[in-house]
Amino acid sequence: MVMNVEIISKEIIKPSSPTPHHLRKFKLSFIDQIAPPFHFPIIWFYDSKKFVDVEPFERSRLLKESLAETLTHFFPLAGTPINEEFSINCNDKGVDYISSSSPMQVITSDTQSKWQ
């Protein structure tokens, strides 16, 4: 099955407040240093019928605002790796935020009970 998805916007979300200077370099633990690299692509799906009273633009704005505030507390996630030093430069570079839309229903009534 082919899924048609329209990308509405792509942007970088940065922490809502800058990382303090004394926390700019985050040293990785020994376990983090020996673990193989991996990536968790995350896609969140929302049933638009549950958000009838909230416009899509407003919903996206709230998600971006929440993400920016979260990155303030989890500042290494918004940084870049320094491979030769086994650390993260907590430079507030930010994370990717992609907003998209699809006319397809992702979870049908048959599969919905499995996800609840």
Regions found by a protein language model. Give the residues of each.
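Non-catalytic N-terminal regions of enzymes
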Residues: 1-116
